[in-house]
Amino acid sequence: MVNHHQFWWRFFPKQELTQIYFSVALRSFAISLISIFIPLYLFQEKNLSFEQTLMFFIFYSVVFAVTMPLAAKFASRFGVKHSIIVGVPLYILFVALLHFFSSAVFQLLITSAVLGASQAFYWMGMHLAFFHASHRKHRGEEVGKRAGVTVLSTMLGPFIGGVLITFAGFKMVFALTVFLLLGSALLLLLNGDGYVPYHFSMKTVFDTKYWKDSLFFVSRGSHVIVQGVVWPLFIFFILKSYFSMGIIGSLMSLSSAILFWSVGRYSDHADKRKIMRWSSVVESGMWVLMALVKTIPQVFAVTVASSLVHAVRESPTGALEYDKAKGQVAAYFVNREIF
């Protein structure tokens, strides 16, 4: 007689890269329920000033960078998937702190620090796990698949989050996020935490060979802050609705999902650097247009256009990063996040 636990286990993915895709999808959906609304939650619901809201995310970035070397050492000793798993309870703690958040500066810094530590442990483990499971000749396609899966899974997240916040409040969204995050951790451990041998030394943090990439690293970080914090606040003043914000988030996902995979696959047989160069120029132009929007139709049009351009750029860029990091993956990504 087959044990019912063994029976259901057969339906879960067995290949490591597929497990990563599934886990990333579930986590991305969970976080997409609230991520676009976090700046608005702090600014609108908790009455923080724009400067305080920005300080929250700047401090998060600092903690993220400082914690990255610690996460790399942790992953080298306890396993890369355990590093990812550590990020889950930390993110759940962050959600709890958000729920009970007050405008006190101390609580603002603590909540921000927990988010930074959560992301550091998750992304250090994810970069290492993905590098180990992916294949160099197909890395453009595989990075594209990961990005595409992420985008597809977040397609309805902001919309659902906006509806739930509008009719049930933030508490319901926080609870659903926690439940889904636990599920993403379970998926990742289906094959255990296979040992991925690598070495990381704190000395690499000060290795000058990474300094030549500092402008690129800074541009990546700036994009995250502007896209995730400044842009949502900026367009909320135009849209004035959580529901509309949810639609915007879903549109961003819908417009770029297929492009991530198709451009990634194409880049495996083309000049990745050439794609990256011309798409970077176009994306810079998109940011100029985003600063000029004043009406709701303009918000929707520029959001879709910028998402498409970013999708073209991201897959070949991500593949080049993993290729460049070979041999010292942890050191490369630690330095990237510090800058």
Model-assigned labels for residue ranges:
Residues 172-190:
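Symmetry-related core transmembrane helices of the 12-TM Major Facilitator Superfamily/SLC fold
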